[in-house]
Amino acid sequence: MAEITFKGGPVTLVGQEVKVGDQAPDFTVLTNSLEEKSLADMKGKVTIISVIPSIDTGVCDAQTRRFNEEAAKLGDVNVYTISADLPFAQARWCGANGIDKVETLSDHRDMSFGEAFGVYIKELRLLARSVFVLDENGKVVYAEYVSEATNHPNYEKPIEAAKALVK
């Protein structure tokens, strides 16, 4: 199990840590229009999943903007940002900030993604900052659990992993 801190204090992650080589576990999240989306909907394309605690914080804002910029250069790759924010808040933020290459998804309903990927912070009901890259069959080829949730993830490594898979 990954161990992380939030503002310097240890927190409990619920679920099983996902590792490179694992088949990504199934989950269900909500789109901004309240439609369900699952792992099955992501298969068939290389997928980057950027996980953030809340879209309305500085690092999460910067992380989502960075992956939106990178998504424009990647070609046929799914790029998602998942948080526990309400879908309406995600849609408002994306609209206000011109985010159109990354699709935001909400895990607020039942934390299905958070538990499946081992990123659900029990004490805060938020998701831990992390990044995953899946191949077109849903196999994990990159996984990063950021050790301090208020820090930035590595941006270059997941982008490189996704580029290596695009044919």
UniProtKB/Swiss-Prot annotation:
**What would be one Pfam family of this protein?**
Redoxin
* Catalytic residue positions: C60 (cysteine sulfenic acid (-soh) intermediate)
Q: Which reaction does it catalyse?
A: a hydroperoxide + [thioredoxin]-dithiol = an alcohol + [thioredoxin]-disulfide + H2O
The intrachain disulfides are C60-C94, C60-C94
Per the entry, induction is: By superoxide.
What does the UniProt keyword field contain? Antioxidant, Disulfide bond, Oxidoreductase, Peroxidase, Redox-active center
Per the entry, what this protein does is: Thiol-specific peroxidase that catalyzes the reduction of hydrogen peroxide and organic hydroperoxides to water and alcohols, respectively. Plays a role in cell protection against oxidative stress by detoxifying peroxides.
More details: The active site is a conserved redox-active cysteine residue, the peroxidatic cysteine (C(P)), which makes the nucleophilic attack on the peroxide substrate. The peroxide oxidizes the C(P)-SH to cysteine sulfenic acid (C(P)-SOH), which then reacts with another cysteine residue, the resolving cysteine (C(R)), to form a disulfide bridge. The disulfide is subsequently reduced by an appropriate electron donor to complete the catalytic cycle. In this atypical 2-Cys peroxiredoxin, C(R) is present in the same subunit to form an intramolecular disulfide.
Q: Which NCBIfam families does the record match to this protein?
A: PRK00522.1
Family indicated by similarity: Belongs to the peroxiredoxin family. Tpx subfamily.
Protein name as annotated: Thiol peroxidase
Q: What is the originating organism of this protein?
A: Bacillus subtilis (strain 168)
